Amino acid sequence: MLTIYAPFKNKKSKAWEVFNGVQKSWPEQVAVNDNTIATDPLSNSMFWGFVNNNLNLVRKLETRKHKFWFTDTPYFGRFDNNNLKPDNHYWRICKNKIHATYIKGCKADRFEKFGLKVKAPNFKGSYVLVCPSSAGINDYLDRPKWTEETIAQIKRYTDRPIKLRHKP
């Protein structure tokens, strides 16, 4: 059985775009619990980001070495929150981790369909762009001051201005 921990009070949350699809297609029985209620999580659980109690629930499952699924926004190809349709977005789903730790050998067409061109790094730009993760991710990684630490480290190697782009 899969147990989804979801925001019950916000059925318009993008998390439900994932969870509704999972409920329809998961090969086993699916139960949904409110992620605002502190509880002891069940093995084989699914979460969307680190909202509400999800961070604590994931940490408990990791400590016990129990299976969980972590879903969140993709690494690239953001979506339009005002125009979500079944065919115009995708999500990130990781098993027992919050990020993919390896890249499976897939055909190139899976990437090419996004129409993105990978550019070489520009080491001669006029500024350095820092794109920090959310506070929840930094807390999970035990790096609450990641942004400040990263900027301090960059300043050791360049005098170019540093610009921040927070998560949209």
Model regions: which residues?
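A short helix->loop->beta-strand "cap" motif at the edges of active sites that frequently abuts
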Residues: 63-68
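N-terminal pre-catalytic "stem/leader" segment of glycosyltransferase-like enzymes
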Residues: 1-55, 136-137
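Short, well-ordered alpha-helical microsegments
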Residues: 53-58, 147
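A short acidic, amphipathic alpha-helical/loop segment
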Residues: 56-61, 153
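Residues that mark the start of a beta-strand
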Residues: 1-3, 126-127, 161
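Catalytic donor nucleotide-activated moiety binding site of glycosyltransferases and closely related
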Residues: 6-10, 131, 147-168
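Generic beta-sheet signal
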Residues: 48, 70-73, 165
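A nucleotide-sugar donor-handling region in carbohydrate enzymes
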Residues: 71-143
